[in-house]
UniProtKB/Swiss-Prot annotation:
Its main location: cytoplasm. This is Uridylate kinase. GO terms for biological process: 'de novo' CTP biosynthetic process; UDP biosynthetic process. UMP binds at G55, D75, I137, G138, Q139, P140, F141, I142, T143, T144. InterPro entries: AceGlu_kinase-like_sf, Asp/Glu/Uridylate_kinase, Uridylate_kinase, Uridylate_kinase_bac.
Length: 249
């Protein structure tokens, strides 16, 4: 298709997108199928796709205090959670398509995932494979948001899509607490940082700003939202260097 906005994308998925409705369900089979179908809708247009998974449905590094363990150890557990999520997504994608899917991990776990090697990841993309990146960058104190921005730059992605669960984009206040909260349609990187908007890790936005990586923050629960973004439609919030702060109608 010649009217595509992007040719290569990184999509950052939260662990919450995979989670069942019960607090005891780390995964939901219907949600996994839905995620796979949404990703494949993009892939089927000829777009190269990289996925980065969060691990919050299994374990969060910021729960270290609750578990009375050091933050570094908690982050290590969280990295393992992202590997589990990546393997579940791989299985779902392979069930719904004939595409080859590769899980690449920043920590060694070679029985189930390839090590992340940039040149190998680029080779996979050239061959038309789907790539799922897990275990962050292999270091504690680094969020998966930052990982997503770094990997998007390493793999020469045209943009980063940040898929949120139940949130339509960036708001000027918490829409769950403030009925008058307004959604931004577009933002410059500096607008996001100066206004201390907290839907995404600021270090990731700063890295994107330094290298002019466009960011789309959108509600993944909205069917075909990611595909429509790739077709040029205004969905969610778009963040870049050459956009002005505007609210949605």
């Amino acid at each position: 298709m010649n009217n595509l906005r992007y040719n290569r994308l990184l999509i950052k998925l939260s662990g919450a997108a995979l989670k069942g409705d019960s607090n005891t369900d780390n995964f939901d089979i219907k949600k996994l199928k839905y995620i796979a179908q949404e990703i494949l809708a993009i892939k089927n247009m000829g777009i190269e796709v990289v996925l980065v998974t969060g691990g919050g449905n299994i374990f969060r590094g910021n729960s270290a205090e609750y578990w009375k363990i050091e933050r570094a150890e908690a982050d290590n557990v969280g990295m393992l959670g992202t590997i589990i999520n990546a393997l579940m997504l791989k299985a779902a994608l392979e069930k719904e398509s004939n595409y080859k899917v590769r899980v690449m991990s920043a920590i060694k776990i070679e029985a189930v995932a390839e090590p992340f090697i940039r040149s190998r990841a680029l080779s996979h993309l050239y061959k038309g494979y789907l790539i799922i990146l897990a275990a962050g960058i292999g270091q504690p104190f680094i969020t998966t948001d930052y990982t997503a921005a770094q990997r998007a730059l390493e793999l020469r992605c045209d943009a980063m899509l940040v898929a949120k669960h139940g949130v339509n984009g960036v708001f000027d206040s918490n829409p769950k607490e403030d009925t008058n909260a307004r959604q931004y349609c577009t933002l410059a990187y500096d607008d996001f940082l100066i206004n201390q908007l907290n839907i995404m890790d600021h270090s990731a936005v700063l890295l994107a700003k330094q290298h002019n990586l466009p960011i789309h923050i959108f509600n993944f629960d909205q069917e075909l939202a990611a595909k429509n973004i790739c077709l040029g439609k205004n969905i969610g919030t778009y963040i870049s260097s050459n956009t002005k702060m505007q609210f949605s109608n």
